[in-house]
Amino acid sequence: MATAEIEEIPALLKPGQTVAGLDLGTKTIGLAVSDLGLSFAHPRPVIKRVKFTIDAQVLLKALETDKVGVIVIGLPMNMDGTAGPRVQATRAFVRTMQPLTDLPFVFWDERLSTVAAERALIGMDVSRGKRADRIDSAAAAFILQGALDRLHMMRRNDYDAG
């Protein structure tokens, strides 16, 4: 499967699978993984980018280890809602990954995710040096948590309507 919509995630997951969040940078790939209840995003170590084949291999191994069934990837939109300069690179990354995995990708607007992640790390009194190492995975967790919160709201609305 190529890409999916956020609303499709529950139907795509098999029992025991999690959801991953990715923050794609030029030097690193931030990674976060949900719990089985799809309530909380947990940052994982960043993946240092080398070249695509190595990056993909490391990423796919991490996704397999965490029993990931769906990947939510941040789409770097501009504040006015238009596609930012990194949107094309993100879409190209997904297109290049698709032949390597059956996992579906869900694009998620990541506006201000890095800013929010940095503020959270500052709030936790993480030193500047350690923040640089953790920012991309913290941003991935922020992206994934936004998607998980949306899923939770959808379930709640379905429950209230039923």
Curated annotation (Swiss-Prot):
PANTHER family: POLYNUCLEOTIDYL TRANSFERASE, RIBONUCLEASE H-LIKE SUPERFAMILY PROTEIN. GO terms for cellular component: cytosol. Belongs to the YqgF nuclease family. Its main location: cytoplasm. This is Putative pre-16S rRNA nuclease. One of its GO terms (molecular function) is nuclease activity. It is found in: Cytoplasm. Could be a nuclease involved in processing of the 5'-end of pre-16S rRNA. InterPro entries: RNaseH-like_sf, YqgF, YqgF/RNaseH-like_dom, YqgF/RNaseH-like_dom_sf. HAMAP family: Nuclease_YqgF (MF_00651). Its EC number is 3.1.-.-. It comes from the Bacteria. Keywords: Cytoplasm, Hydrolase, Nuclease, Ribosome biogenesis. The keyword Oxidoreductase does not apply. It is an enzyme of class 3 (hydrolase). GO terms for biological process: rRNA 5'-end processing.
